[in-house]
């Protein structure tokens, strides 16, 4: 399947690092380094716009290496790029580490994962919802079933 991309000057197509990779790496399309202080965030351009077919989305996800080595993650991960969006994909990076992180021009900053999506009809009901072992247990309750 092909997704057609429009590239700004200096940007490059997303690339899969291996034949089994789920996420395609995207790079920072910046001319100068950007410093992200500990506890801060920055919106980093990629220079990529994508013609996403109806029924698909692109999820923007953290790169595991940046997360484990530096504490740098994609905020709101996964971020969603909807099929009807045609603007530039930009990445919100957050520095959860203890040191300033420098985003260099051309650095791999995130991964794009293509996923099928389906819109459904949400219907209000006054009936009880189907019973499950988990029931109404929320955050932290999946291991208690």
Swiss-Prot record:
Domain of life: Bacteria
Reactions that this protein is recorded to catalyse: dUTP + H2O = dUMP + diphosphate + H(+)
Biological or metabolic pathway of the protein: Pyrimidine metabolism; dUMP biosynthesis; dUMP from dCTP (dUTP route): step 2/2
Binding-site list for substrate: 63-65, 76, 80-82
Cystine pairs: none
Keyword Hydrolase: yes
Cofactor(s) of this protein: Mg(2+)
One Pfam family in the UniProt entry: dUTPase
One GO BP: dUTP catabolic process
Alphabetized UniProt keyword annotations: Hydrolase, Magnesium, Metal-binding, Nucleotide metabolism
Annotated EC: 3.6.1.23
Single Gene Ontology MF annotation: dUTP diphosphatase activity
Role noted for this protein: This enzyme is involved in nucleotide metabolism: it produces dUMP, the immediate precursor of thymidine nucleotides and it decreases the intracellular concentration of dUTP so that uracil cannot be incorporated into DNA.
NCBIfam families cross-referenced by the UniProt entry: dut, PRK00601.1
Protein family per UniProt: Belongs to the dUTPase family.
Name of the protein in question: Deoxyuridine 5'-triphosphate nucleotidohydrolase
Organism whose genome encodes this protein: Chlamydia muridarum (strain MoPn / Nigg)
């Amino acid at each position: 399947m092909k997704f057609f991309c429009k590239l700004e000057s200096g940007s490059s197509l997303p690339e899969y690092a291996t034949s089994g990779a789920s996420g395609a790496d995207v790079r920072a399309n910046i001319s100068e380094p950007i410093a992200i202080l500990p506890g801060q965030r920055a919106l980093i351009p990629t220079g990529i716009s994508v013609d996403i077919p109806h029924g698909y989305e692109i999820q923007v996800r953290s790169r595991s290496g940046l997360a484990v080595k530096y504490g740098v993650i994609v905020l709101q991960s996964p971020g969603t790029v909807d099929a009807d969006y045609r603007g530039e994909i930009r990445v919100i990076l957050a520095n959860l580490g203890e040191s300033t992180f420098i985003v260099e021009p051309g650095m791999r900053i995130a991964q794009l994962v293509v996923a099928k999506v389906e819109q459904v009809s949400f219907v209000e009901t006054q009936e009880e919802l189907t019973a499950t072992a988990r029931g109404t247990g929320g955050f932290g309750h999946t291991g208690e079933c």
